[in-house]
Design a protein with these regions (language model features):
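Bacterial N-terminal signal peptides
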Residues: 5-18
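Formylglycine-dependent sulfatase
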Residues: 16, 22-397, 405-416
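N-terminal secretory signal peptides that target proteins for export/translocation
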Residues: 1-2
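C-terminal helical cap and adjacent loop that interface with cofactors, partners, or active-site loops
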Residues: 402
Length: 416
């Protein structure tokens, strides 16, 4: 009899716990992040008529895009340091590309907070955090990680990362261009040559490929009947993989596409300016993503996080500036800091004796870099194209994005 009573009590407790778990799951959104690599907001929804990105464009049409979003770092690993921690990498020791340092004692990566709150957290599959992981971070993190592997009814946080637009893919040959190289807009800092046009056209082709990947993930969510329960983010990890974008903390290296969608059920968690088909001028950067995802899950972001939640239960006030940085990039050291208010970009070069265009083997594998440098050496580059290679570089730079989106007219010495 005693055994039967114990079993009955256990069954009641289990049923009660199951009901609580189901209730909690119903009160918390699923969160899906679809990410890509090395691309700026060169997408149709951002007004780029040369781009072919129908899936992200459709997401933006029913959601909202951010026009002033920065990565913090113009290269992948430090950018991911920022994302996973909610901290600026210079404050953690992970500023340099391919670092491996621990977080301070007691600090955690944001998926650990989510898992403690009952979320199933999957990452498919790039990590590259520049940080030593403080224990188990994900429920699964590999090429098979998927929200489908969670317990039935469990809320999920899932990342799917596409590498198809990575810098290395811009220069892969042979490549049959889908986007016509003749129709490329070549930025003022690049020479207008067939090699440069080919690289830019191939870059746009690769952005179309990651858009197709995004479409597959969105369809999978819809087919599973989960679209109405899931908050979606689409973003890239930093600016384009073209030279003078990737690795440089100016707008071309830091500005990223960020598109979000909040279904009706979770619209109360959206930023106040959120509306279907809208565009926000709020300044956000990657340091804000960790506190934001915790806030969306109903978790108070820890005080040590340096970012500010822009949505969810614990929103912070809008910020007047966002910040970027550059440290060692592969085999070349540098020290640069940058800031923007959305219109002006200020850059402080602490090592002006080093040119912007220091020789990085990985970057010189891109045809654009080689032909650009050769034209500079032969004296055939324009003034705007020569700035990148000159020594010394200006200690301070100031650009007005409204009149100079390519950031080639330095206003730092202007009396105005």
């Amino acid at each position: 009899m005693t055994r039967l009573l114990c079993l009955a009590a256990l069954a009641l407790f289990t049923n009660h716990f199951s009901l609580i778990t189901s209730s909690q799951a119903a009160d918390r959104p699923n969160i899906l992040w679809i990410t890509s690599e090395d691309h700026s907001p060169n997408m149709g929804c951002y007004g780029d008529k040369f781009a072919s990105t129908p899936n992200v464009d459709a997401l933006a049409a029913r959601g909202m895009l951010f026009r002033r979003a920065w990565s913090c770092a113009p290269v992948c690993a430090p950018a991911r340091t920022t994302l996973i921690s909610g901290l600026y990498p210079p404050s953690t020791g992970a500023e340099h590309m391919r670092s491996m340092v621990p977080l301070p004692v007691g600090f955690k990566m944001y998926p650990q907070f989510l898992r403690e709150a009952g979320y199933y957290c999957s990452n498919n599959s790039k990590e590259d955090y520049n940080l030593a992981k403080p224990g188990q971070v994900w429920d699964e993190s590999n090429g098979k990680a998927h929200w489908k592997n969670r317990t039935a009814g469990q809320p999920f946080f899932a990342i799917f990362n596409s590498t198809k637009s990575h810098e290395s893919q811009i220069r892969t040959r042979p490549h049959i261009a889908v986007h016509d190289p003749a129709k490329v807009r070549v930025p003022a800092y690049h020479p207008d040559t067939p090699e440069v046009r080919q690289d830019w056209a191939q870059y746009y082709d690769k952005v179309s490929e990651v858009d197709a990947d995004a479409g597959r993930h969105l369809k999978e969510l819809t087919d599973a009947g989960l679209a109405d329960d899931t908050i979606i983010f689409y973003y890239a990890d930093h600016g384009s993989g073209m030279p003078r974008s990737k690795r440089w903390p100016c707008n071309s290296g830091l500005q990223v596409p960020v598109v979000v969608h909040f279904p009706a059920k979770w619209k109360h968690l959206a930023p106040p300016e959120y509306k279907a088909g809208g565009a926000s001028d709020r300044l956000i950067s990657f340091v804000d993503f960790a506190p934001t995802v915790l806030s969306l899950a109903g978790i108070q972001p820890p005080a040590w996080m340096q970012g500010h939640a822009f949505a969810g239960k614990f929103p912070a006030p809008m910020q007047p500036f966002i910040f970027g940085f550059r440290g060692r990039m592969d085999e070349r050291i540098d020290c640069v800091r940058s800031a923007t208010d959305g219109r002006y970009v200020y850059v402080r070069n602490f090592m002006p004796h080093l040119s912007q265009g220091q020789h990085v083997d990985y970057q010189f594998a891109t045809p654009t870099t080689r032909v650009w440098f050769d034209l500079f050496k032969s004296g055939k580059a324009t003034e705007a194209q020569s700035i990148f290679w000159r020594v010394p570089k200006a200690p301070e730079e100031l650009y007005d994005l409204t009149t100079d989106p390519d950031e080639v007219k330095n206003l730092a010495a202007s009396p105005q």
